[in-house]
């Protein structure tokens, strides 16, 4: 297959899921995207061809896996324009963020400030709340101002006491993105010793990120939201910071010696952050995934298609007088909304009855837990205009008919 103009129907042929579930429309991609056939085949291939542990360096098969893990680390590094030594494999983006927050603990002093938004995924809120409590740091909450950009609001709260700025690059609830590079530049001017942590979980599948062009210290994402396997997260940690950071998990082969006074000497990075047997199968599958995109599909064209899909989804949703969008500044195709007359659970149930998968609730955003619920539609590159039109048709159903279907 050669690279051509992106065609979603051609792309769908790379997923057996659509053959096995022809009646379903997947609009819950921000939770987990469908895995490429390349990925599922790689998982099977790993167990059939290898199924060995990289910590044994004698057998040839083990050494092949060691080489594949190193190669995958380099492929990820190339994708983000960083060095392989700055890429760490974890179990999830959640673990990655916890790893970095835990590692910063000795650097945070009472009175230091941690700047973050409260209406983001709890994975990029709870670790910082815990860090503040453990270190007696002060949490500074960012509230979007009507007459100010989100970037300027962040910058207005940064001062010499700021030690960490935790940024979610794209909201999993609202689909709007933030220029984290601009905030990082400003923070480093105000306090060069401060840290910028970026949650890019909802960004990497929609935008190309060149970390080398930024001053961020950390970035996290999960492969299962980018057509990849579950159980694998990736953390970028700036190489110059790694020697000072303590690992989150201890064990395995991450150390060189233990002194008589119980001081642990860790191996060189990134191995000291990867205690225990890694998810080798998922790393092997990630290798195949990145090679697939490099060889068979043009990611720039995919991003352009995603932008077009976002525009069409917005127009269809915004034109329905019964639908109230949570915001109107989406940068990626993620939309949260309410129905003027229906509870979100009823609307989501109606869509499920008609074979459309969506998410409903507070969607892992603690601020809205037990307070404010939404229906979320999140798209990927295999979604089509035809699917969006089907959604629009269902949302145009009169309220009485929807309720009648739900209570059957």
Swiss-Prot record:
- The top EC class, named as a word, is transferase
Q: What is its EC number?
A: 2.8.1.7
Q: Please name the InterPro entries in this protein's record.
A: Aminotrans_V_dom, Aminotrans_V_PyrdxlP_BS, PyrdxlP-dep_Trfase, PyrdxlP-dep_Trfase_major, PyrdxlP-dep_Trfase_small
Q: Which residues carry this modification: N6-(pyridoxal phosphate)lysine?
A: 225
Q: Which SUPFAM superfamilies match?
A: PLP-dependent transferases
Task: Please tell me whether the keyword Ribosomal protein is annotated for this protein.
Answer: no
Gene3D superfamilies xrefs = Aspartate Aminotransferase, domain 1, Type I PLP-dependent aspartate aminotransferase-like (Major domain)
Q: Carries keyword Transferase? A: yes
One GO MF term, please? cysteine desulfurase activity
Catalyzed chemical reaction(s): (sulfur carrier)-H + L-cysteine = (sulfur carrier)-SH + L-alanine
UniProt keywords, alphabetically: Pyridoxal phosphate, Transferase
User: Which cofactors does the annotated protein need, by name?
Assistant: pyridoxal 5'-phosphate
**Function field:** Catalyzes the removal of elemental sulfur and selenium atoms from L-cysteine, L-cystine, L-selenocysteine, and L-selenocystine to produce L-alanine.
Into which family does the record put it?
A: Belongs to the class-V pyridoxal-phosphate-dependent aminotransferase family. Csd subfamily.
Spell out the protein name for this chain.
Answer: Probable cysteine desulfurase
Name its species: Mycoplasma pneumoniae (strain ATCC 29342 / M129 / Subtype 1) (Mycoplasmoides pneumoniae)
């Amino acid at each position: 297959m050669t690279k051509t103009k992106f065609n979603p129907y051609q792309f769908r042929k790379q997923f057996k899921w659509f053959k096995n579930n022809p009646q379903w429309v997947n609009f819950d991609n921000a939770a987990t995207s469908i895995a490429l056939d390349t990925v599922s085949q790689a998982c099977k291939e790993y167990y059939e061809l290898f199924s060995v542990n990289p910590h044994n360096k004698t057998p040839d098969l083990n050494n092949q896996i060691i080489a594949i893990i190193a190669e995958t680390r380099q492929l990820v590094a190339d994708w983000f324009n960083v060095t392989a030594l700055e890429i760490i494999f974890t179990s999830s983006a959640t673990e990655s963020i916890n790893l970095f927050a835990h590692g910063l603990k000795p650097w945070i002093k009472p009175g230091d400030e941690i700047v973050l938004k409260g209406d983001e995924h709890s994975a990029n809120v709870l670790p910082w709340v815990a860090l503040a409590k453990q270190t007696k740091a002060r949490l500074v909450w960012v509230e979007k101002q009507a007459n100010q950009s989100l970037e300027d609001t962040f910058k207005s709260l940064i001062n010499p006491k700021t030690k960490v700025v935790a940024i979610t690059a794209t909201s999993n609830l609202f689909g709007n993105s933030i220029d984290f590079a601009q905030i990082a530049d400003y923070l480093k001017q105000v306090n060069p010793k401060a840290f910028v942590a970026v949650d890019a979980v909802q960004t990497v599948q929609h935008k190309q990120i060149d970390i080398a062009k930024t001053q961020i210290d950390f970035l996290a994402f999960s492969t299962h939201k980018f057509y990849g396997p579950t159980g694998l997260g990736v953390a970028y940690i700036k190489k110059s910071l790694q020697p000072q950071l303590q690992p989150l998990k201890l064990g395995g082969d991450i150390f060189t010696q233990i002194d008589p006074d119980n001081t642990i000497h860790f191996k060189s990075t990134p191995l000291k952050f990867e205690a225990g047997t890694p998810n080798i199968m998922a790393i092997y599958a990630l290798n195949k995934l990145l090679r697939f995109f490099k060889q068979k599909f043009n990611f720039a064209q995919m991003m352009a298609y995603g932008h077009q899909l976002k525009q069409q989804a917005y127009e269809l949703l915004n034109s329905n007088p019964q639908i109230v969008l949570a915001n109107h500044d989406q940068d990626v195709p993620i939309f949260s909304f309410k129905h003027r007359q229906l509870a979100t659970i009823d609307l989501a149930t109606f869509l499920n009855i008609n074979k459309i998968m969506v998410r409903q609730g507070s969607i892992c955003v603690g601020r809205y837990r037990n307070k404010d619920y939404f229906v979320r539609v999140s798209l990927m590159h295999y979604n089509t205009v035809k699917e969006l039109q089907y959604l629009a048709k269902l949302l145009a159903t009169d309220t009485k008919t929807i309720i009648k279907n739900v209570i059957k």
